[in-house]
Design a protein with these regions (language model features):
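N-terminal lobe/hinge region of extracytoplasmic solute-binding protein
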Residues: 1-13, 135-137, 141
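Surface-exposed binding/hinge segments that line
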Residues: 13, 17-21, 36-121
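Gly/Pro-rich hinge or "lid" segments in bacterial periplasmic/extracellular proteins
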Residues: 76-77, 97-100, 105-176, 180
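Ligand-site clamp/hinge motif
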Residues: 128-134, 160-217, 366
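Append "and occasionally in soluble cytosolic enzymes with long acidic Gly/Pro-rich linkers
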Residues: 149, 157, 162-163, 247-358, ...
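Ligand/substrate-recognition segments at binding pockets and active sites
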Residues: 154-157, 174, 199, 320-397, ...
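A bilobed periplasmic-binding-protein/Venus flytrap-type ligand-binding module shared by bacterial periplasmic
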Residues: 162-166, 229-254, 258, 267-268, ...
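Detector for C-terminal structural segments
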Residues: 258-293, 345-358, 380-501
């Protein structure tokens, strides 16, 4: 459903020009207080190519816009291919016939309008501080002061959402029933938080997940307070291919083979939360069936046993030994270094990370295992290549839009590796994979495109840069007096549709 857009994007026959019309009457929240124009969307897109506002999606999905920088720019670049012939028209000119992909990617947050006259002073800092002074166009805003500073945001503690006084209901399809929303952050004990929701009043879950014991209880005692949303996503354990011994594909295949993926799934609640994964494109996304569906081919013997196969793991470790990796005669890693593994400190992710650590230890790996907040996991460790994290057990990717490219390009294309906010957690940079992704990305939606990405998915799986273990269904819980509405795109509660009974 179009939001700020007045209608769906129009794509030229050669797939190199995209035209979008936006609605009139949509205004920024205080202190900007003016109507949104396409110049604000142009600036929003341009700023994501700046080194001050690094965003892996910029080059991953929008890198074919004419004039787009190939690497993060100093300052905010002016991109010739993002054009605004009038205040309600946005035109994107592309260097390659990728109109279908770029148009689909316009749903992503980096296209949310940003007023340049207000944001430039924040974007001039490295990193930008606009996120601490952000303005809004929807029904809600984070409480702020007259200068725009977010007084309603207490980092790692809470967020206060209030109504945006400039929101005009006639321009929006969202009902926005609630007048005020309080968000608690920093809930390191997910069991306590989840039980508080189920037994409390006017509460819904945020971006955390209820631990497995609570989920089982919710499925039996609180059935009317539980929704399972097909997530269109894959959870996996990433191995840094830039760090020894994970620069060796046979070592990675051995890790994949030894992994008890069912034990991993049990940490989140068992079969209720999804099917055991063996590759990266999930069910419900074009390319899934083309790549073999639920069952791996016999050629991928390391992916065949969800409970793990020590014999197959040993076979691949001995292959790695022949290539010079220090491995004992019985197939255990003989290196003495401790490999940095960073997991989340909240269940069920914490338990998943602990199970993952056990799998590596089965093969003789010595770990330096750190647990941090979910936010820090990405912003300071797994999303920052210079942090030199060898193993990220709590990563995964969920649909940016319903197309296989969104699961392959930002996560496994070496050209998408970023110094911050990096989503290619294994840092896979295989020239053949990169070339195949670039070739498939210009294909129009349809069987040829989906088969091409299925083949790439197979090729990536064969390299084993990560161990996929769950095709996710997201469990959402709410208090008994809440009429929650799930957002099937982002797989969280939609606060703009949720109400109190």
């Amino acid at each position: 459903v179009p939001d700020i857009a007045a209608s769906d994007p129009q794509i030229s026959s050669d797939q190199k020009t995209i035209t979008v019309k936006i609605k009139k009457g949509i205004k920024f929240s205080p202190p900007v207080n003016r109507e949104v124009t396409t110049k604000d969307i142009k600036y929003a897109m341009e700023r994501t190519f700046s080194a001050n506002v690094p965003n892996p999606y910029a080059t991953g999905y929008f890198g074919t816009i004419q004039g787009a920088p190939k690497t993060p720019a100093k300052g905010i670049p002016s991109i010739s291919g993002i054009q605004t012939p009038d205040d309600q028209t946005l035109v994107l000119k592309l260097t390659q016939p990728k109109g279908a992909t770029v148009a689909a990617a316009l749903v992503m947050p980096l296209t949310m309008p940003v007023p340049p006259e207000y944001a430039k002073k924040f974007d001039a800092k490295n990193p930008s501080t606009y996120n601490q002074n952000v303005v809004f166009t929807g029904p809600y805003m984070v409480q702020n002061n007259a200068a725009g500073s977010l007084t309603g945001w207490k980092p790692a503690k809470s967020i206060e959402l209030i109504r945006n006084p400039n929101w005009d209901k006639s321009t929006d399809y969202r009902p926005a029933y609630l007048d005020k929303i309080h968000i608690d952050e920093g809930n390191s004990d997910a069991t306590v938080a989840s039980r508080r929701i189920l037994n409390g009043s006017a509460l819904v879950q945020g971006d955390g997940a209820p631990p497995a014991p609570v989920l089982k209880q919710a499925a039996t005692r609180f059935k009317n307070q539980l929704q399972l949303v097909p997530a269109g996503g894959t959870r996996y354990v990433a191995m840094n291919t830039k760090i020894k011994p994970f620069d060796n594909a046979d070592v990675r295949r051995a890790v994949f083979a030894i992994f008890d993926r069912n034990a991993m799934r049990l940490t989140r609640g068992g079969s209720i939360v999804g099917d055991i994964a063996w590759r990266y494109i999930p069910p419900g996304i074009p390319g899934f069936d083309e790549a073999g569906g639920l069952n791996p081919p016999s050629s991928l013997d390391f992916a065949s046993n969800p409970a793990g196969d020590p014999a197959v793991a040993k076979k691949y470790m001995l292959k790695a030994k022949a290539a010079g990796v220090p491995v004992t005669a019985d197939g255990k890693y003989a290196g003495t270094e401790k490999l940095l593994m960073v997991g989340t400190n909240a269940d069920p992710g914490k338990k998943s990370a602990e199970v993952a650590a056990n799998q590596f230890e089965k093969l003789g790996f010595k770990l330096s295992f750190r647990i941090v907040t979910q936010d820090a996991l990405y912003t300071k460790f797994c999303g920052v290549p210079k942090a030199q994290v060898a193993i990220c057990p709590n990563v995964g990717f969920f649909k940016d839009f319903v197309d296989p490219e969104s699961f392959i390009n930002p996560t496994f294309n070496g050209e998408a590796i970023q110094p911050a906010n990096n989503n290619n957690w294994p840092q896979l940079d295989d020239p053949a994979i990169n070339k195949a992704i670039d070739a498939a990305a210009i294909l129009a939606p349809g069987p040829e495109r989906y088969k091409a990405f299925a083949k790439i998915d197979d090729d990536i799986t064969a390299l084993a840069p990560a161990v996929p273990w769950l095709w996710d269904k997201t469990p959402l819980i709410e208090s008994k007096d809440v009429q929650g509405v799930a957002d099937n795109y982002s797989t969280v509660w939609s606060l703009s549709f949720t109400s109190l009974k």
